[in-house]
Amino acid sequence: MNSQQSTRTKQMLQQSSTHLLCGVVLLQLFAAQVDAQRSTSPWQTLSGDAPLVIARGGFSGLFPDSSLAAYQFAMVVSVADVVLWCDVQLTKDGHGICFPDLNLANASNSEEVYPNRQKSYPVNGVTTKGWFPIDFSLTELQKVLFSLIRGILSRSGKFDENGYSISTVQNVATQMKPALFWLNVQHDEFYEQHNLSMSSFLLSTSRTVSIDFISSPEVNFFRKIAGGFGNNGPSFVFQFMGKEDFEPTTNRTYGSILSNLSFVKTFASGILVPKSYILPLDDKQYLLPHTSLVQDAHKAGLKLYASGFANDVDIAYNYSWDPVSEYLSFVDNGNFSVDGMLSDFPLTASASVDCFSHIGRNATKQVDFLVISKNGASGEYPGCTKLAYEKAIKDGSDVIDCPVQMSSDGIPFCSSSIDLVNSTTVGQTHLRNRSIIVPEISSVAGIFTFSLTWHEIQSLTPAISNPFRENGMSRNPNERNSGNLISLYEFLNLAKNSTSLSGILISLENVVYLREKKGLDVVKVVLNRLTETGYIVGTLKVMIQSTTRLVLVDFKNQSTYKTVYKIKETIGNITDSAIEDIKKFANAVVINKASVFPNSDSFLTGQTTNVLERLQKFQLPVYVELFQNEFVSQPFDFFADETVEINAYIFGAGINGTITEFPYTAARYKRNRCLGREEVPPYMLPVNPGGVLTLISTSSLPPAQDPNPIFTHDDVTEPPLPPVIAKSPTSTLGTPSTIAKPLRNFLKVIRIVSWSVAGVVLFLVLLTLVFCFHRKRETRLRQQKLKALIPLEHYTYAQVKRITKSFAEVVGRGGFGIVYKGTLSDGRVVAVKVLKDTKGNGEDFINEVATMSRTSHLNIVSLLGFCSEGSKRAIIYEFLENGSLDKFILGKTSVNMDWTALYRIALGVAHGLEYLHHSCKTRIVHFDIKPQNVLLDDSFCPKVSDFGLAKLCEKKESILSMLDTRGTIGYIAPEMISRVYGNVSHKSDVYSYGMLVLEIIGARNKEKANQACASNTSSMYFPEWVYRDLESCKSGRHIEDGINSEEDELAKKMTLVGLWCIQPSPVDRPAMNRVVEMMEGSLEALEVPPRPVLQQIPISNLHESSILSEDVSVYTEG
């Protein structure tokens, strides 16, 4: 920054604390500030001008909404005519403040400062609790301890301790001096009911403040202020809410008003609508065809502004988590352009309008670097499939990559992982029994490529990677299993036939293991394939990448292909000797993003790392990985915008190439017109690493971290490659060279054979005797071990027969055995579950029983004994007269339970699961929670039973390694079906519990549920019906007719808990201890969960490849 800018900044520091903050912003985040240059491209707006960028509450995507810091930052990083948006609220003494919500608690610390000032008021006909500005004076709201905080909890809370104060409308206008100022009045009628006049405030404010826009969702408000501002007054914009919501002053729905835009034109010059009014989404979050609303508004002479833009919220899957693509779809689609966009991230909106609009795929490139795909366009299709590679080529990749793996029969192919579980649905197929642990590769069991033939691999279904599934972010679910894996030969031909690619990158890992253990020479195979497909001479550059130095040396010695050395570790520096060594065998280097910009707690630290500079000094190009569009992959410094991140690494750091799962985003950046200007606008200047941290209060700073290690010559040194082992030859039958033999040789052979036969017979007799002795001894020792291990009665199989009177009375059947009624010698009636005959030594069964024998809880069925005799196994537990829960909720008994009884049962089951998950010495995950496995005693106290599918795990283990699918269809958690849904853990039981609770609710409302589902020709998803029924209760009606308020509260609480438990992503589900708190807490404390999404479960595959429990009662009598 030049001396004049530094002087100007110092002056700002002396003016006020607010200007101090903004001066730091200017110093730390951006290298310069220049006026944006408007594009001269034609626009399809009403005026023909570029769409307005409207900053909602300033830059509210980073700073607390409506803080002076948010407003000034928006002005610094946006287009010159950015519109500052202020949601106007009135204090009890009539002052207008900028605050985003009628309830102060939603974006301030009012609850902490004024804990006893909560009140209830009717707002649009709904009684609402909160802290309202009409109960506070401006002085009270501007006291030192009162401050603004984030209103959206998923955003960083680091700025909550900065003490940003509430500002008046006049304060924002005079301090910020915005080019355009927009005041939004959301609740005029509410203030009028409390003797506060919003219209009077605005009219008096307009005498000292320049107001350019006034918006409101209330028709009468515009009638009151009509004519009050004169001919040169602000533009009036009518704001539309949800189409089914009622406009409070006309009692008409906004949807009905939308159909009469000529009526709106009588009092407004523009309309503000949610973006879904223009580009609606289907139930799966995909775009539907655009509506004609923009064209209709323009025909009526109305400008149309769109709201709801934010980089860190869910957007249509069509945009591939790229916010720039979303903005462009509203302003540059060839059909229409909105007149403005209301955004929490005005920097991205500014860049979209000014830098990326109206540029085609063939536009001039403003910057040169390599766009290298990662497993093709693997952010949009399953990686390494033909579809992913074709998409990567179409999207503008310069280089496509193939991570080479080897099949057992020596066929090289492209796959993102040597473990097929990570990239396909092999775990759901009959091939899951190929699972092994290879310590040289991973400590986790997997199904490795070298264990399957190429024919078997070709039969597998690929699976899209979902690295942020636990954050609730999925990738293109419609295509999650599309495409087919391709061989290296097919990959090479696909690339060769492309006219746009400049090269290919082939990555090789695990080469040493494959040579030494499997006899597979990957280097030789790859070289042969390259030769066969004509890559010896050609225009495409071939790059060979590996983390193993000697693999690259081997290629160097046998070919002229370029080699790329990948440094796996995150490093903070690199020595000259290490670089000199690398340069001997590599032409380029790959490092990760943190080796360029270190970060801590999702913020760039600003620590100096000169790794990139040092490598480039030795003439080594540096490619950086991994670039992903999902905002959770990026530090907060990049404002949840992948384009900002790419800009920092290309324009800021100067890397030579990006390795990305979303090639389109990186390729589009090359055509960024703003980079070709003499003065680059502020929204395209690279952020300065560590700049955002300087704006955070000391108390909220992340802990200091040790510097990343230095990469030295020793890190490059490796032992020599082992020789390729010879594969075992296939045995063949030989043919004697002659048939004629001397007679004596024939007799000699006869004698040898005779003695050999006799010896074999004697050996077998001795072996049988030893085996019998050993087996008896082993059985005796095993019985002694069992008695010491399990503190339960150990019954013989003969005793089990006597207890059950030779299995006379069947009381239930399950997927793993039959339940009989029996009587012990002391007269106690018991249930005896006899498991189906099993092979093996039964260690899993013994471990399960041993652990369960040490459990004791009111809501867990009590084990009384067991039998383990050879393949005969049985469990003996208490007999419960009322049988299983399903009888009562499915109407198989005359007993009709009320909501209180059902609530107690649901709560009891929750307590039981909480005990299994959080109170046992070793956590037990049940995996088969359903009404049939909940038994009821004579007091209807529930007890969780049937642990046939249970799995034990240490409490510290949050993720379970499983290759089979366990449970009952309808209750199985999505992550049990495929890893693309998330990881299997104790949260899988939470999902099953949620379905159990919802089934209880559905049973109580059976007639209503049947009517709703029958009326939907697409067979309504059951949780969807529950959710809709819950929504209909917001109006005040009970969730079931004929019940009292207490029962209605219990029913609604169960509904909310059930819906939270069945969230598709495990991370969004509460743990069972939290479920118990929710069930026992107040209804008011529960938030409404997101709407459940229908998951299509491949049932046919489940039956083929899973451990499924039959959906039958544990007890059929009682």
Swiss-Prot record:
GO terms for molecular function: ATP binding; glycerophosphodiester phosphodiesterase activity; protein serine kinase activity; protein serine/threonine kinase activity. Pfam families: GDPD, PK_Tyr_Ser-Thr. The chain crosses the membrane at residues 752-772. Disruption phenotype: No visible phenotype under normal growth conditions. CDD domains: GDPD_SHV3_repeat_1, GDPD_SHV3_repeat_2, STKc_IRAK. It is a single-pass type I membrane protein. Keywords: ATP-binding, Cell membrane, Glycerol metabolism, Glycoprotein, Hydrolase, Immunity, Innate immunity, Kinase, Membrane, Nucleotide-binding, Plant defense, Receptor, Serine/threonine-protein kinase, Signal, Transferase, Transmembrane, Transmembrane helix. The active site is at D928 (proton acceptor). Glycans are attached at N106, N195, N251, N260, N318, N335, N362, N422, N433, N497, N557, N573, N656. Residues 773-1118 are cytoplasmic. Residues 805-1094 form the Protein kinase domain. Residues 1-35 form the signal peptide. The keyword Transmembrane helix applies. One of its GO terms (cellular component) is mitochondrion. Atypical receptor-like kinase involved in disease resistance. Gain-of-function mutant plants snc4-1D show a dwarf phenotype, express constitutively the defense marker genes PR1, PR2, and PDF1.2, and display enhanced resistance to Hyaloperonospora arabidopsidis isolate NOCO2. The two glycerophosphodiester phosphodiesterase domains are predicted to be extracellular and the kinase domain cytoplasmic. In the N-terminal section; belongs to the glycerophosphoryl diester phosphodiesterase family. This is Protein SUPPRESSOR OF NPR1-1 CONSTITUTIVE 4. The lineage of its organism: Eukaryota, Viridiplantae, Streptophyta, Embryophyta, Tracheophyta. The gene is LRK10L-2.6.
